[in-house]
Amino acid sequence: MQNSPTEYLKPRVVDVDVISPVRARVTLEPMERGFGYTLGNALRRVLLSSIPGFAITEVKIDGVVHEYSTLDGVQEDVVDILLNLKGVALKLNSKNEATLTLNKSTEGVVTAGDFDTGHDAEIANPDHVIAHLTKGGKLNLEVKVEMGRGYQPVPQRRKTEDEDRVLGFIQVDASFSPISKVSYQVESARVEQRTDLDKLIMDVETNGIIEPEQAIRDAARILMGQLSVFADLEGAPSEVEVKQAPQVDPILLRPVDDLELTVRSANCLKAENIYYIGDLIQRTENELLKAPNLGRKSLNEIKDVLASKGLTLGMKLENWPPAGLEKV
């Protein structure tokens, strides 16, 4: 218990509940009033955005020249195969980049476990389904695996619009984050006669590449590194220009009608409560394909229109929707 206004309670880890190999709930208490929300929100944001991981960034499939192709003897089309490859959770132990191969010609299910990983790569979800082969079908592919942070659509990774691409390789949007879900809860805590303290409960789920407890430790170290400069704050020798936080891009506040989609596509979006472009870009391809009456043709139309404006599906926006935004 602190004895003066300049002393603060230091929380301790009181419980680590390992719910599964990929999920854990960590409880810390006691904290000064308000610190639970302050630290919980900071840790959550760092966990979701700043923990490095690995993802498939390019794919080469034998017999395929573009993503809208189909393969004989394979139930899924190439677009579906690419979507399934995005769900493969993997890591490299000693490299930041590698190429993995998968070759299968027997009838049945093709899973992530069919990759030839060698000695350096590990796959956390080997049962993840990539495709289904019928009699006589075969699937031979190569994937490029890279290390990164957060979500990076293809246009963001290209150095220039006319960047040279390796012949036969299809670039895909990459989600590098190994964190699947993060939530936090703040409850009341008590120390002696004080009942106005906080207890912070962090609930973290990963894709299996990193343990939840290690992810929390890494996030805390990132925060400490960023905040340490404030602890040793000194007068700067020269003025440093401080850039204001960017405002919401005006294009995201425009209604989806401004995209001039076909009537069918526009009606499907509104039926899913997607009224603004900012609503649309946060949806993934899988989510849109689950919408009634929205098929592959409509999805491709939406992706092409967004790409023409430098946007893509699956983007993440902070503080959306902005205050005062109304349904149209």
UniProtKB/Swiss-Prot annotation:
Check the record and name the SMART domains matching this protein: RPOLD
Molecular function GO terms recorded: DNA binding; DNA-directed RNA polymerase activity; protein dimerization activity
Q: Is Hydrolase included in the keywords of this UniProt record? A: no
Where is the segment annotated Alpha C-terminal domain (alpha-CTD)? 248-328
Name the InterPro entries on file.
DNA-dir_RNA_pol_insert, DNA-dir_RNA_pol_RpoA/D/Rpb3, DNA-dir_RpoA, RBP11-like, RNAP_asu_C, RNApol_insert_sf
Q: Which GO terms describe its biological process?
A: DNA-templated transcription
Q: Report the catalytic activity.
A: RNA(n) + a ribonucleoside 5'-triphosphate = RNA(n+1) + diphosphate
Q: Where is this region: Alpha N-terminal domain (alpha-NTD)?
A: 1-234
Q: Which family does it belong to?
A: Belongs to the RNA polymerase alpha chain family.
Q: What does this protein do?
A: DNA-dependent RNA polymerase catalyzes the transcription of DNA into RNA using the four ribonucleoside triphosphates as substrates.
What protein does this entry describe? DNA-directed RNA polymerase subunit alpha
Q: Which organism is it from?
A: Methylobacillus flagellatus (strain ATCC 51484 / DSM 6875 / VKM B-1610 / KT)
